[in-house]
Amino acid sequence: MKLFIITVVTILTISRVFDKTPATTEARKSKKMVGHEHFNEYLDPTFAGHTFGVVKEDFLEVKKLKKIGDENNLKNRFINEFAPTNPEDSLGIGHPRVLNNKFTNDFAPTNPGDSPGIRHPGVVNV
């Protein structure tokens, strides 16, 4: 009982000293910022350096998927999605083998000064 009385007196004292009730929240209205309207009628999505919308030039034309049984199939992109890239790699999950390309075992640096031996294998079109 003594602890309860001390707690209530402490809360009342703090609320009078700081002139606030202990469990209130206060908010003020947001200011309208000039030039920062979200829905600006003069918006130009192709303005240099800014892309606010989707522009037709953002898309690339790609090949259609092969059909199996008159249906498009997403799995036709790869021979085996969970095959290693090279015979000496460990079995299991690796980079997929691509249908139109052949992976070479070329581990030479790309430019003078690069560290030799560490990079993805080169891809050669067949």
From Swiss-Prot:
Q: Which positions are listed as propeptide?
A: 20-80, 96-105, 121-126
Q: Which terms are listed as keywords in the entry?
A: Apoplast, Developmental protein, Hormone, Hydroxylation, Secreted, Signal
What InterPro entries does the annotation carry?
CEP
Induction remarks:
Accumulates in shoots in response to nitrate depletion and to osmotic stress (e.g. mannitol), but repressed by ammonium chloride NH(4)Cl and nitrogen starvation.
Could you give one GO CC term from the UniProt record?
apoplast
Q: Mind listing the GO biological process terms from this record?
A: cellular response to nitrogen starvation; nitrate import; regulation of leaf morphogenesis; regulation of root development; regulation of shoot system development; response to ammonium ion; response to nitrate starvation; response to osmotic stress
Q: Which domain of life does the UniProt lineage start with?
A: Eukaryota
Q: What is this protein called?
A: Precursor of CEP2
The source organism is: Arabidopsis thaliana (Mouse-ear cress)
Q: Which gene encodes it?
A: CEP2
